[in-house]
Amino acid sequence: MTDPAFVTDEELWALRYKVRRELIEFARRKLLQQNQRVTPGDYIRFDHLLNPDALTIGFARRFATYKRAPLIFQQFDNIVKLVRDKQRPVQFIFAGKAHPRDDDGKRFIQPLIHLRKHSELAGHVVFLENYDIHVARQMVAGCDIWLNNPRRPLEASGTSGMKASCHGCMGFSIMDGW
């Protein structure tokens, strides 16, 4: 259908919920694979990680320092309140890779890996490794909000956010890119 008058609000919300649930299930499978690779033999339940009913904020792209992925966690106490809110839960899914010769970009991923293990954020903040087109597809389709907070004026276009908006994802951005 190309005429939005033929799609009811209920159908639209049902579709958004379906693609978010698919993203959550995909992320759980990826996290299980990551864990088995890093700590084989360890049994961790991944079915409790991420909530299909929670507002899902995504950040998936090449990791470069100017893109400032971990910036939002500078307000750590506020983030903890958001993810712990039982009435309106929020969760974060990060994915990406640094350029092979970008050591600073590689180091920029480390705080996210450590944050996901923090007891107050566990299960609400995840990092999906081995970012590729398949991960990108799942993320741009399933996230509710796309995070974009690069250092101005360094973002040329912000295509990941453009793709996410085509799937009904809202942008949470500074005035750069997009």
Which ranges hold each PLM region?
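Catalytic cores of carbohydrate-active enzymes across secretory and cytosolic contexts
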Residues: 1-178
